[in-house]
């Protein structure tokens, strides 16, 4: 992405970047440049994925110790929650939460050690590039609604009971404190 193709905004979390891609459209449709290597010189993306979600889905909170992510919203709207657990992992502080609402053409770069999840506010297509191929041993997660973490998720009006739609895996995730204990006691 060149300076003409994207705009970036700062984050409170070290290494996290937010931005918006330029959409070039005419009567035929639209074109968007999703990624350019020189815009992320320290990241070597090796796999691209496409996730689709119906409104009301929460995915996360997921954590990788060996993978950076670049998310691009293809279509729809997402409430994105990022939780920097690097200070907690190092034993030097507590997790820090940052949230943003991202629309089509918005992107976020998520470095290793920053947990991430989203709520599909409306039907959502999320494209994500990652710096490592899928590795199940690096698929960590903690409860999206962990009260100690306190992500300020928006109220849901898209499901009858106001609860999000989650996967069985995400619904079974432990608390962040339990995950940190497991990580600290696991061999590298």
Where are these regions (language model features)?
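Non-catalytic, conserved peripheral segments adjacent to functional cores
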Residues: 1-104, 123-128, 132-188
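Conserved metal-binding segment of the jelly-roll/cupin
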Residues: 101-122
């Amino acid at each position: 992405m060149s300076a003409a193709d994207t705009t970036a905004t700062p984050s409170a979390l070290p290494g996290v970047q937010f931005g918006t891609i330029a959409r070039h459209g005419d009567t035929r449709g639209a074109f968007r440049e999703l990624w350019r290597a020189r815009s992320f010189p320290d990241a070597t993306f090796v796999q691209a994925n496409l996730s689709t979600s119906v409104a009301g889905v929460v995915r996360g909170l997921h954590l990788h110790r060996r993978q950076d992510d670049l998310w691009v919203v293809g279509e729809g709207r997402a409430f994105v929650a990022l939780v920097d657990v690097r200070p907690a992992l190092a034993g030097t502080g507590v997790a820090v939460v940052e949230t943003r609402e991202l629309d089509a053409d918005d992107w976020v770069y998520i470095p290793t050690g920053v947990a991430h999840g989203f709520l599909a506010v409306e039907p959502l297509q999320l494209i994500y590039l990652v710096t490592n191929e899928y590795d199940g041993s690096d698929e960590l997660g903690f409860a999206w609604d962990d009260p100690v973490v306190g992500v300020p998720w928006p109220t849901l009006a898209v499901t009858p009971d106001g609860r999000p739609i989650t996967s069985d895996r995400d619904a079974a995730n432990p608390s962040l404190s339990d995950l940190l204990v497991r990580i600290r006691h696991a061999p590298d």
